[in-house]
Amino acid sequence: MTITMLKSKIHRATVTEANLNYVGSITIDKALMDKSNILEYEKVQIVDIDNGNRFETYVIAGEENSGVICLNGAAARMVQKGDKIIIMSYCSLTIDEANKFNPTVLFVDNKNNIEKLTNYEKHGEII
């Protein structure tokens, strides 16, 4: 048996663009992808902190160190430029693997620069 666990998270990223006329996906700064352990074309869940929308899409790599967080295609209707979002990816693990696993959690500032990289988060704490 396997269970689904949080693998990677980019916390409170700022949407820099919403491009309705582009083929679907989310464009993420390659540096943020690398640090958060999110791969190109990986399925991600997006949570918009400002409006509560939750949806899934896949990742394409943006220019490294550009700070780009751009929702493309239909997903562009779910956010607005300037919204704060949480980007999460998941993995399937056995119970034994899950008990030893820690997710990668990346905190960014208002310009999507890396503030902190951790392997855990606790309720009630902003690390």
From Swiss-Prot:
<dbReference type="GO" id="GO:0006523">
    <property type="term" value="P:alanine biosynthetic process"/>
</dbReference>
<feature type="modified residue" description="Pyruvic acid (Ser)">
    <location>
        <position position="25"/>
    </location>
</feature>
<comment type="similarity">
    <text>Belongs to the PanD family.</text>
</comment>
<comment type="subunit">
    <text>Heterooctamer of four alpha and four beta subunits.</text>
</comment>
<dbReference type="InterPro" id="IPR003190">
    <property type="entry name" value="Asp_decarbox"/>
</dbReference>
<comment type="pathway">
    <text>Cofactor biosynthesis; (R)-pantothenate biosynthesis; beta-alanine from L-aspartate: step 1/1.</text>
</comment>
<keyword id="KW-0670">Pyruvate</keyword>
<feature type="active site" description="Schiff-base intermediate with substrate; via pyruvic acid">
    <location>
        <position position="25"/>
    </location>
</feature>
<feature type="binding site">
    <location>
        <begin position="73"/>
        <end position="75"/>
    </location>
    <ligand>
        <name>substrate</name>
    </ligand>
</feature>
<dbReference type="GO" id="GO:0015940">
    <property type="term" value="P:pantothenate biosynthetic process"/>
</dbReference>
<keyword id="KW-0068">Autocatalytic cleavage</keyword>
<keyword id="KW-0865">Zymogen</keyword>
<feature type="active site" description="Proton donor">
    <location>
        <position position="58"/>
    </location>
</feature>
<keyword id="KW-0566">Pantothenate biosynthesis</keyword>
<feature type="binding site">
    <location>
        <position position="57"/>
    </location>
    <ligand>
        <name>substrate</name>
    </ligand>
</feature>
<dbReference type="GO" id="GO:0005829">
    <property type="term" value="C:cytosol"/>
</dbReference>
<keyword id="KW-0704">Schiff base</keyword>
<dbReference type="GO" id="GO:0004068">
    <property type="term" value="F:aspartate 1-decarboxylase activity"/>
</dbReference>
<dbReference type="Pfam" id="PF02261">
    <property type="entry name" value="Asp_decarbox"/>
</dbReference>
<protein>
    <recommendedName>
        <fullName>Aspartate 1-decarboxylase</fullName>
        <ecNumber>4.1.1.11</ecNumber>
    </recommendedName>
</protein>
<keyword id="KW-0456">Lyase</keyword>
<keyword id="KW-0210">Decarboxylase</keyword>
<dbReference type="InterPro" id="IPR009010">
    <property type="entry name" value="Asp_de-COase-like_dom_sf"/>
</dbReference>
<keyword id="KW-0963">Cytoplasm</keyword>
<comment type="function">
    <text>Catalyzes the pyruvoyl-dependent decarboxylation of aspartate to produce beta-alanine.</text>
</comment>
